[in-house]
């Protein structure tokens, strides 16, 4: 009989504490302690990156909860791809709307396995006055972004959170992801433009630092790989480190083979399916693929 990875959870549920690791507890974000846990003060001071699950996802929840009750916050724009039925993210957005703030949620109703749940959450938020947008008919809105606009010293100032993982507090305890908090004007302007695009208010404009998929991401990644190939051929330092959910795209795989053959050292961190064959002589001998992070 084949055993799926999910079946292993039944083994873990056995009462054999000596065979198990101690429960892992995410550490608090040290940066916030310097600012009495005031997310906006911390972001205003300097951008910071949070590494989940080693650092707690609570910082993302706190960021939205503080926005929901902050009298200076005038608007929140949020993407929702996958979350929980009792999500504190949803509660924060509805609380913000109840407090009279302009709240927009881009909810993806084509998220696999969560279609029904996302529709129910969208209806719940809409009843509280959250403006709901369902994204594009032919595409999945997979971006993970949150934009908060505050009125400061008579002007509007933007704050942004972007991440590699969903706004899903439970998964964030076991999924390895990165969060960026920033008030950088160029990045904030990019995220504003992307939300305007997703909500149908404007066509996509030229972006400063954010790369949008599908229009531009492939070309950007190819250009970056080409640059490493060029460096390797000139005997300059080169290397590629890529983290992704899966790798099945034939063109991207061919490009990575090309880089490996040119002498570029490549490390791939791939959670799921990987169609690239590492370690093949004269093809992919410079490529290492890792899938599991363990203790």
What spans do the regions from the language model cover?
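N-terminal localization/anchoring segments of enzymes in phospholipid and broader phosphate metabolism
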Residues: 1-240, 258-262, 274-295
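Short, flexible helix-loop junctions that flank or precede catalytic/ligand sites
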Residues: 243
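Short, catalytically relevant binding-site loops at active-site mouths
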Residues: 247-249, 273-276
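Glycine/threonine-rich ATP-lid/beta-loop region of ATP-binding domains
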Residues: 250-253, 257
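Hydrophobic alpha/beta core scaffold segments
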Residues: 265-269
């Amino acid at each position: 009989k084949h055993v799926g990875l999910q079946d292993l959870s039944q083994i873990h549920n056995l009462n054999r504490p000596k065979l198990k690791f101690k429960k892992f507890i995410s550490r608090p974000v040290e940066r916030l302690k310097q600012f009495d846990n005031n997310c906006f003060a911390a972001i205003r001071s300097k951008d910071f990156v949070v590494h989940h699950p080693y650092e707690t996802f609570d910082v993302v929840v706190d960021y939205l909860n503080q926005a929901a009750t902050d009298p200076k916050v005038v608007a929140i724009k949020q993407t929702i791809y996958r979350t929980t039925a009792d999500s504190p993210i949803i509660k924060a957005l509805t609380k913000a709307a109840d407090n009279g703030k302009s709240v927009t949620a881009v909810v993806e109703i084509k998220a696999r396995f969560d279609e029904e749940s996302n529709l129910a959450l969208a209806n719940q938020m809409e009843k509280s006055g959250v403006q709901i947008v369902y994204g594009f008919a032919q595409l999945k809105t997979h971006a993970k972004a949150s934009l908060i606009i505050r009125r400061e010293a008579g002007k509007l100032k933007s704050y942004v959170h972007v991440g590699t993982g969903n706004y899903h507090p439970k998964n964030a305890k076991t999924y390895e992801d990165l969060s960026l908090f920033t008030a950088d004007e160029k990045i904030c302007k990019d995220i504003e433009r992307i939300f305007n695009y997703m909500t149908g208010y404007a066509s996509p404009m030229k972006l400063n630092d954010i790369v949008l998929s599908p229009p531009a991401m492939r070309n950007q990644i190819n250009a970056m790989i080409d640059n490493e190939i060029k460096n390797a051929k000139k005997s300059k330092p080169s290397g590629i480190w890529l983290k992704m959910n899966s790798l099945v795209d034939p063109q991207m795989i061919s490009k990575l083979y090309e880089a490996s053959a040119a002498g570029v050292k490549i490390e791939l961190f791939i959670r799921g399916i990987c169609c690239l064959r590492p370690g093949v002589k004269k093809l992919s001998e410079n490529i290492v693929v890792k899938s599991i992070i363990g203790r």
